[in-house]
Amino acid sequence: MLVWLAEHLVKYYSGFNVFSYLTFRAIVSLLTALFISLWMGPRMIARLQKLSFGQVVRNDGPESHFSKRGTPTMGGIMILTAIVISVLLWAYPSNPYVWCVLVVLIGYGIIGFVDDYRKVVRKDTKGLIARWKYFWMSVIALGVAFALYLVGKDTPATQLVVPFFKDVMPQLGLFYILLSYFVIVGTGNAVNLTDGLDGLAIMPTVFVAAGFALVAWATGNMNFANYLHIPYLRHAGELVIVCTAIVGAGLGFLWFNTYPAQVFMGDVGSLALGGALGIIAVLLRQEFLLVIMGGVFVVETLSVILQVGSFKLRGQRIFRMAPIHHHYELKGWPEPRVIVRFWIISLMLVLIGLATLKVR
């Protein structure tokens, strides 16, 4: 929005030309989202407390979590608000990739909001019925994937980028829709599963978004894309603005979500952020890179799948509790230790993922 305004004002004052620089807009996008999130935090927490929108804690969870009962939840609303406002201010409104991310972000946020509302208002620990949650998540993911396929059919936008192999970029055809669906829905659920400890999900989300900001910048720059042997996508550059907005909003939220948390993001935050990371990976053609950089989310999800599968097939559990962060809690690790170690692992995986772009 401000970019368009600056384009009209630059003829009166050349200084407005700074708004055309992607790096400048990326920085101010981060700062805008950060300040909005910090400003909204105390007000959102007070409002949630007044409405008695407190966290519902399962009785079969770790005993250390019982003290979290009643902590305000649905704080993801302030994350999404900060991201959307920042993106609308600093990204080019005509960019289709930006709107794809916003559709998934807001759509998944609405699904998460309904889920949270049922939990905190109706006191239903199960929230939105699973089949309806997956149905609406699938509708959004398939709708966006199908639209992208129609527009990008038989172009680099529907190729599969394989790490370590610079000349292996097969056209996916209709499989593009299926892959995109699983990436978007899967990442949404993976971040949702990871959001079980104070600050555990938000910091890896920030790390991955920061990593994708660098990838988006390279993908939208023809020279760097050719140098790294990745597809050049002319709309990809504006995703830098989206990614830095996620970073800023996430850091602002972490101010209030760090241990001991004053507020939880709820499904309205975790589903939306996960879906956003998924669609960003799809748009950048970096689904494999998401698996590497988002390794913490992958492991958390696999721990649940293995736990459920093992119990159904053998009647035995592999972990003391799943997702795996609860396993370490029950082993006696203090919650802050689990959180920070997972953060360290996440940062390492993002750096490893970025390194794979050059190792080809």
UniProtKB/Swiss-Prot annotation:
Ranges facing Periplasmic side: 1-25, 93, 153-167, 220-235, 284-287, 359-360
Catalytic activity: UDP-N-acetyl-alpha-D-muramoyl-L-alanyl-gamma-D-glutamyl-meso-2,6-diaminopimeloyl-D-alanyl-D-alanine + di-trans,octa-cis-undecaprenyl phosphate = di-trans,octa-cis-undecaprenyl diphospho-N-acetyl-alpha-D-muramoyl-L-alanyl-D-glutamyl-meso-2,6-diaminopimeloyl-D-alanyl-D-alanine + UMP
Subcellular location: Cell inner membrane
A GO cellular component entry from the record: plasma membrane
Record-given protein name: Phospho-N-acetylmuramoyl-pentapeptide-transferase
PROSITE patterns: MRAY_1, MRAY_2
Record gene name: mraY
Job of this protein: Catalyzes the initial step of the lipid cycle reactions in the biosynthesis of the cell wall peptidoglycan: transfers peptidoglycan precursor phospho-MurNAc-pentapeptide from UDP-MurNAc-pentapeptide onto the lipid carrier undecaprenyl phosphate, yielding undecaprenyl-pyrophosphoryl-MurNAc-pentapeptide, known as lipid I.
EC number: 2.7.8.13
Homology family: Belongs to the glycosyltransferase 4 family. MraY subfamily.
Positions in the Cytoplasmic compartment: 47-71, 115-131, 189-198, 257-262, 309-337
Membrane topology: Multi-pass membrane protein
Primary localization: membrane
Pathway: Cell wall biogenesis; peptidoglycan biosynthesis
GO MF terms held by the record: metal ion binding; phospho-N-acetylmuramoyl-pentapeptide-transferase activity; UDP-N-acetylmuramoyl-L-alanyl-D-glutamyl-meso-2,6-diaminopimelyl-D-alanyl-D-alanine:undecaprenyl-phosphate transferase activity
Disulfide bonds: none
Listed Pfam families: Glycos_transf_4 (PF00953), MraY_sig1 (PF10555)
Highest taxon in the source lineage: Bacteria
Cited InterPro entries: Glycosyl_transferase_4, PNAcMuramoyl-5peptid_Trfase, PNAcMuramoyl-5peptid_Trfase_CS
Residues spanning the membrane: 26-46, 72-92, 94-114, 132-152, 168-188, 199-219, 236-256, 263-283, 288-308, 338-358
Native source organism of the sequence: Salmonella arizonae (strain ATCC BAA-731 / CDC346-86 / RSK2980)
Cofactor(s) this protein cannot do without: Mg(2+)
